């Protein structure tokens, strides 16, 4: 089991686009998530966005760096950033993404 939540206990069903970057020394990195039309922004949803929670069998990774994107005053997307400050954090994040990707049909490709 691997899922993403914006409000504790409410799984996000929209699969994001994820972009990874790593520092030149390989010790730190960043993951940017982009959710187009996420269910948490649906008109019917009354849940507050309290962060982004990446939850799997090992536990959870939490970020509070979550931003809404608006078009014509209407919320349309969420962009969230996870900062990875060490190799163990990077490794943990990649294990989560392997599980999440396998369950949600995400693939991994390196940029040119």
Curated annotation (Swiss-Prot):
Part of the photosystem II complex. It is found in: Cellular thylakoid membrane. Keywords: Membrane, Photosynthesis, Photosystem II, Thylakoid. It comes from Synechocystis sp. (strain ATCC 27184 / PCC 6803 / Kazusa). The keyword Thylakoid applies. The keyword Thylakoid applies. It is a peripheral membrane protein. This is Photosystem II reaction center Psb28 protein. One of its GO terms (biological process) is photosynthesis. One of its GO terms (cellular component) is photosystem II oxygen evolving complex. Pfam families: Psb28 (PF03912). Belongs to the Psb28 family. HAMAP family: PSII_Psb28.
């Amino acid at each position: 089991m691997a899922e993403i939540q914006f409000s504790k206990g409410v799984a996000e069903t929209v699969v994001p686009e994820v972009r990874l970057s790593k520092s030149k020394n390989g010790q730190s990195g960043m993951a940017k998530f982009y959710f187009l039309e996420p269910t948490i922004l649906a008109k019917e949803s009354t849940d507050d966005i309290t962060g982004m929670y990446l939850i799997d069998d090992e536990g959870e990774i939490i970020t509070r760096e979550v931003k809404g994107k608006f078009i014509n005053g209407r919320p349309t997307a969420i962009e969230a950033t996870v900062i990875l400050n060490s190799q163990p954090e990077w490794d943990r994040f990649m294990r989560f993404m392997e599980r999440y990707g396998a369950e949600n049909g995400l693939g991994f490709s390196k940029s040119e």
